[in-house]
């Protein structure tokens, strides 16, 4: 059944949180000073228009994506994360759900808590809050 040629569309509650994880961590891993890094992230975000596993979600994302010159935003993690924050907010509003973050700052704090290792849990490495978020 899953091997037939017809597409299998899935409800967002099944795949959504996993996509957000990949989107957010991809942006955090991007080097905004390196053009190839920005270009790959741009292509990744562009490709979501055609690969989201929900046709309605694809259509909504296409409309949202096409309103912005994504390449200009990719020179700043703050700007691209603000774009993601507004996308998430728009989705929740469209679905009649309360958005869990009252401000962009609360969203950033959540990202830091979820994805940035605490110093006591990590040996000295190139990953640090200062390096990753002071450039926002």
Regions found by a protein language model. Give the residues of each.
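Terminal, compositionally biased segments used for targeting/anchoring and flexible tails
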Residues: 1-136
């Amino acid at each position: 059944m899953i091997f037939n040629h017809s597409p299998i569309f899935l409800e967002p509650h099944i795949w959504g949180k996993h996509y957000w994880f990949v989107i957010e961590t991809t942006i955090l891993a991007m080097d905004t000073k390196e053009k190839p890094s920005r270009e790959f992230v741009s292509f990744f975000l562009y490709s979501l228009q055609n690969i989201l596993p929900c046709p309605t979600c694809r259509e909504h994302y296409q409309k949202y994506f096409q309103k912005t010159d994504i390449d200009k935003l990719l020179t700043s993690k703050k700007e691209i994360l603000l774009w993601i924050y507004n996308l998430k907010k728009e989705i929740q509003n469209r679905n009649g759900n309360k958005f869990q973050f009252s401000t962009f700052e609360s969203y950033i704090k959540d990202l830091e808590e979820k994805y940035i290792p605490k110093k006591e849990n990590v040996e000295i490495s190139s990953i640090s809050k200062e390096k990753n978020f002071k450039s926002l």
